[in-house]
């Protein structure tokens, strides 16, 4: 998690500085109220009206790991059940965002996932509200390749959830089996 410069990548409402603490809350799965809050904070900040942000593909990696952990303890932990239900819906939304635009003309994604956090694409090290506002208002804030990469790599993370979806489809729980089968966008 420390390899991602969270404080230097954009979200819907600013920077992703607080994401590591939210991921820890979700990973620990100890308090349902805290888990719900953390999930909302992250998901509301990585997708807004079908727009994905710089933080989205990176957050998706950690949400996928949390999802996998939650699936492994489903029906044993109230938080795990909630996380699986919530993230199934959210992952489908992310897949829809990608697929809705993928048939249109678009640039090539950056060659490597890690290219998205090259220095030239990051916000300044120090937070400056005025500087960030100017950054957001600039229509050339993100190169076309970087911007498309937010969608492309986020979808790749969702696609990597296939084994967990199969596990849910084959579960003894009819609820989880049906829910996973409804996830049709992969």
Predicted feature locations:
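Eukaryotic acidic, Ser/Thr-rich intrinsically disordered low-complexity regions
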Residues: 2, 148, 162-186
